[in-house]
From Swiss-Prot:
This is Uncharacterized transporter Cgl0590/cg0683. It comes from Corynebacterium glutamicum (strain ATCC 13032 / DSM 20300 / JCM 1318 / BCRC 11384 / CCUG 27702 / LMG 3730 / NBRC 12168 / NCIMB 10025 / NRRL B-2784 / 534). It is found in: Cell membrane. Belongs to the AAE transporter (TC 2.A.81) family. It comes from the Bacteria.
Length: 533
């Protein structure tokens, strides 16, 4: 059977994917590996038969797809978060990498390890394939006979790096009794249930209807003006506020109650038997996706947005809230204009299923081209961001841009998740089989255990430092700190595990923030480590 798989790489690929994804769904003590199980299945299969190898282009494309859509998702928040605390994470990442290089140097020197294999161990402990490749290229220019040795150290440390980081994330979450959804809610990534209530404005409240969130100091939105119990009209943000005006406001219950205290007094309001109705529609129009609420000028189209459901979270719309494909929008509209609003927003499942792959192809092309640009280093060598670093930077930038002319860079939620999972699985299957030969050869040497243990020490030090400093110095939530740990390794398997366990995007935020710095830092750091040895 193994010989058959070795002769048929395509069949080997789908078998590894099927078995790995099936094992990944098995839960033990409430934990599961998810797509990360594909890596371990690939490693076992290729160790059993070293001729089973998935072509390199498969996992290069898989990694590029995965990190690109991660960048797209994180892009809108990345630059605003960077201004707040992302720069702190970048400085922390540089200091962490310097510390880990120092730790690796001490381990290699004190244990008398081979310099080339030890440097490979360092790259494997941080699962840096580009870093390992850079060291191989560096050694080829010094002593070509040693060029294969970093691959051995990398192969020995890699499995422990993935498993070690996952164990820290799992055990830490259990010991600290982490409430993943509550942490994400406190960070504004999951909102509390939304409600609506009536309010009559007190004297002295002046301005426009659109000023009410600022005047109340709360994240709310006024959707209706109540002229009498049976006559409601859209709360046009540009309408001037009049004394005693009665409105319907939406937001979380806490925000709405605080807003009512600040603005006036609560009024019992019924929405039945009025000229306006609520209905929920799905965004599928390319003219709408990627635009902000303010850009849509909804009142001119006969409706107001009361709530936006993005993924599993409902948010109160603000003027700068970006509307994305597959967002489900609760609108206030006159019954006679529902069809018009439906045409404007799209509301077509078929359109969402017919994903426009042109922006994806262009974005990936830009990312791969960026990753291929050689960056000169001291000593005449060069480095590049590679097929992981280039696409995630392109994704972050294009995700923040949202759209360029007729091109909408954002993708429907389901398409984004599908491409992400597929790309991750392809990458893990490929990189797992590529490590099998070196891993099998090294297992026959008893000294390989030292390299495995040394790599695990570096991995655990990295994850624990991210946890301790991230939570108690940088004031990150546990999931975001573990996202930073995953970003330090730039390993998709770890972030996939975190996403599966937490059910939120908090880990993704930390991952995307430090990924570019970690990617470049490890490429440089691995070469510096070898030269220091």
């Amino acid at each position: 059977m193994l010989d058959f798989l070795a002769a048929n790489p395509l069949i080997a690929l789908v078998v590894i994917l099927a078995v790995g994804l099936a094992i990944g769904q098995i839960r033990v003590f409430g934990l599961s590996l998810g797509a990360a199980a594909v890596l371990f299945v690939a490693l076992v299969v290729s160790t059993a038969n070293t001729d089973i190898v998935i072509p390199m282009i498969v996992y290069q494309l898989g990694l590029a797809m995965f990190v690109y859509v991660i960048g797209l998702s994180a892009g809108p928040a990345f630059f605003s978060e960077f201004a707040k605390k992302g720069w702190k994470l970048t400085i922390f990442m540089l200091l962490l990498l310097a510390t880990l290089i120092g730790l690796a140097w001490v381990l290699i020197k004190s244990l008398g390890l081979d310099a080339a294999i030890g440097t490979g161990m360092f790259t494997g402990a941080l699962t840096s394939t580009p870093g390992m490749a850079a060291v191989v290229e560096l050694i080829e220019g010094i002593d070509p006979s040693l060029a294969s040795e970093p691959v051995i150290g990398y192969s020995l440390a890699y499995p422990g790096a993935v498993l070690g980081s996952i164990v820290v994330a799992a055990v830490g979450a259990k010991l600290l009794k982490v409430n993943h959804r509550e942490d994400a809610r406190k960070e504004g990534m999951i909102t509390a249930p939304l409600v609506w209530k009536g309010v009559q404005l007190k004297p002295g409240i002046t301005g426009r209807v659109g000023d009410l969130p600022r005047l109340a100091g709360e994240s709310i939105i006024a959707t209706r003006i109540v002229d009498d119990p049976h006559t409601h009209r859209l709360a046009d943000p540009d309408l001037p506020i009049t004394e005693g005006m009665e409105l319907l406001i939406n937001g979380t219950e806490e925000a709405v109650d605080r807003a009512i205290k600040a603005l006036g007094e609560e009024r019992e309001t019924k929405i039945e038997d009025t000229e306006l109705i609520y209905t929920r529609l799905t965004v599928s129009s390319p003219e709408v996706a990627g635009r902000t609420v303010a850009e849509l000028d909804t009142v001119a189209h006969g409706f107001m947005i009361a709530r936006i459901r993005q993924g599993d979270s409902e948010v109160v719309p603000k003027p700068d809230t970006v509307i994305n494909y597959s967002d489900r929008i609760r609108v206030v509209v006159a019954p006679g204009r529902v069809a018009e609003v439906r045409r404007f927003l799209g509301d077509s499942e078929k359109s969402l299923a017919d994903v426009n792959l042109l922006p994806l192809a262009i974005g990936l092309s830009l990312g791969l081209l960026l990753g291929a640009i050689p960056i000169p280093l001291p000593g005449g060598t060069t480095m590049s961001l590679g097929f992981g670093g280039g696409p995630i930077i392109a994704g972050l930038i294009l995700g923040a841009l949202k759209h360029t002319g007729p091109l909408t860079w954002q993708m429907p939620f389901h398409a984004n998740r599908t491409i992400s999972t597929l790309g991750l699985a392809l990458f893990l299957a490929g990189v797992g089989t590529s490590a099998g030969a070196g891993f099998r050869a090294a297992l026959t040497d008893s000294s390989s255990l030292i390299y495995m243990a040394g790599g695990l020490v570096i991995t655990l030090a990295s994850a624990l430092l991210c946890a301790v400093i991230g939570m108690w110095v940088l004031r990150l939530r546990w999931d975001e700190a573990m996202g930073v740990a995953a970003g330090t390794t730039t390993n998709p398997a770890i972030i996939s595990y975190l996403n599966g366990q937490t059910g939120t995007d908090l880990a993704n935020r930390g991952y995307a923030t430090v990924y570019p710095t970690a990617m470049i830092g490890k490429i440089l750091g691995a070469q510096i480590l070898f030269l220091l040895l």
